[in-house]
Amino acid sequence: MPNTPIYQPAAAALQMVQSNQRVFVHGSAATPIHLMKELLAQKDRLHNVELVSITQQGIDLNSPDLAGHFYMNSLFVSESNRKAVNSGMGDYVPVFLSEIPLLFLRGILPLDVAIIQVSPPDRHGYCSLGTSVDIARSAASTAKKVIAQVNPNMPRVHGDTFIPFDRFDVAVWVDEPLPEVSYSEGANEVHNKIGKIVAELVEDGATLQMGIGTIPDSVLKNLTNHKNLGMHTEMFSDGAIPLIKNGTFNNSQKKIVPGYCVTSFLLGSKKLYDFANDNPIIKAMDINYVNDPRILSLNPKVTAINSAIEVDLTGQVCSDSIGTYQYSGIGGQMDFIRGAALSEGGKPIIAIPSVTNKGLSRIVPYLKQGAGVVTTRGHIHWVVTEYGAVNLFGMNMEQRAKALIQLAHPDHREELERSSFERFKH
């Protein structure tokens, strides 16, 4: 007989979590905030609980009071656990986003408990993983126990989102708003310039992937006159909504899931979540499908738009760390950089402002000591700043250096030219 879950208060339901267990926590807009706050409040009875997750919203896992009780074994570092990971209260697992489900499915990271957030069950007894299928589906299917936060505010999203209610060992009814994020608020003139330059690289009929951040949102604002665009992206944000409504994104040229916007998680405003609710044009699918370079490369003109922390003069891209300080993670950047490169007419793009908020150049002679190389100089193609765009594919290292210097801020070009001369003797 199927295991029939019983609704319980959060405090009682979380008694299922015990010391020395590995616990998966649903992420992004699907972060089960109510359950997580209750779990953290129970810290005194728990020791050495390993929390496995990607980006979390609405909770703080950085408090020194959690040391010894919880260990943050992060698959993608974010503000919620960044201090913890860099202070010894946790660590980071370098892994392509497309391969994270394999850690669960192959028993490399066996899960004792999965804490997820879902929509209420429909008349057939199925709940939706809603805004975040990503790695949650594989986690929920392999964990020994599943605790579900059932939230009427979670949209019922179409695709690979459905999970039977009787899969849960215990359920907690929580009526709370989903966390919201706005990427357009931080946009400035530089981001807008970059958005226009990248938009000029996007051809009609292209299939787009937009990474996380302000720049991808700025690109979307400049695509209103494009035609027959398709969407196959790990993340879906507010900027795509007007382009779907006006027919720019009609997905007519795609070879993989034609006619539908393919994504793996949604993160943005309540407007976005309402738009996705029971909207048949959106297909939210497992991350090991959406981000598989072999699959996405079958689409035409895949244009992958991602950002970075710094790029060296040979084209090495650091996107996950500031020196040895772990800032984020590998995520899906390489999945899409490679997939776009393999696509007929594809364009892998790294788009960055030329300088940081402190005025430091993002085009650098060498990456900082200890920095992680996410996109290698063998995988890099297009680089864009507010000063232009260049395709490094096929260039030797000296040619790359000269091209990248022209994308740097004028205040830093002379220093970069000296570094280039010292290295290449020309």
Where are these regions (language model features)?
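Conserved alpha/beta enzyme-core scaffold
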Residues: 1-426
